[in-house]
From Swiss-Prot:
Gene: plsY
UniProt name for this protein: Glycerol-3-phosphate acyltransferase
Function: Catalyzes the transfer of an acyl group from acyl-phosphate (acyl-PO(4)) to glycerol-3-phosphate (G3P) to form lysophosphatidic acid (LPA). This enzyme utilizes acyl-phosphate as fatty acyl donor, but not acyl-CoA or acyl-ACP.
NCBIfam families: glycerol-3-phosphate 1-O-acyltransferase PlsY
Entries under InterPro entries matching the protein: G3P_acylTferase_PlsY (IPR003811)
């Protein structure tokens, strides 16, 4: 099988994997409101945190990361060129953003992109995670933390392993573009800050 055929199959598989909306599925399984029509309207881990609590958000986060990590790792093991590897990673993110199984209404793709970058190396993953956490804690805006982490990702990659700078840059551009509405809301002061749903404790 040629490298082009393998790449096409991996791109298709990555898109289909990315199209599995874990936020919608987790909310359905746990009897939570549909994240596409509640909270911020974004079917991602941050919105699930708002409407469903920490445990549900963690489940969504881990699954979304795996959607990016598994196709990228398989492509890496198959020896695909770094640009082709980038296309596979972008396909997984596009599946998350425009899921064919959920009327093409998806999330921002941040967790999936992070998962796709993680196989490059644990150093990069730690840098990105630390960057997101620092700016999320400072600003209380998940979108700001995501945009800054995505913008710095190509620089981190160039420093750690320059072979993968181009595919990471492709993901970074996609993430920043996907946050255009958040950037507008930040500019107008309408962006929602991070918060966690507080459940009422039942008394017995």
């Amino acid at each position: 099988m040629s490298a082009v055929t393998i790449t096409i199959l991996m791109i298709l598989g990555a898109y289909l994997a990315g199209s599995i909306s874990s936020a919608v599925l987790v909310c359905r399984l746990r009897g939570l409101p549909d994240p596409r029509t509640n909270g911020s309207g974004n079917p991602g881990a941050t919105n699930v945190l708002r409407i469903g609590g920490l445990s549900s958000a963690v489940m969504v986060l881990l699954f979304d990361m795996l959607k990016g990590a598994i196709p990228s790792y398989i492509s890496y093991k198959l020896g695909l060129d770094s640009v082709y590897l980038g296309l596979v990673a972008v396909a997984a993110c596009l599946g998350h953003i425009f899921p064919i199984f959920f009327a093409f209404k998806g999330g921002k793709g941040v967790a999936t992109a992070f998962g796709a970058m993680a196989p490059i190396g644990e150093d990069l993953a730690l840098f990105l995670l630390a960057t997101w956490l620092v700016f999320a804690l400072i600003t209380r805006y998940s979108s700001v933390a995501a945009i800054i982490a995505a913008s710095l990702a190509p620089l981190y990659t160039w420093w750690l392993d320059e072979r993968f700078t181009i595919p990471v840059a492709m993901l970074s551009v996609l993430i920043v573009i996907r946050h255009k509405d958040n950037i507008h809301r930040l500019w107008t002061g309408e962006e929602t800050k991070l918060s966690r749903k507080k459940r009422d404790k039942k008394t017995t």
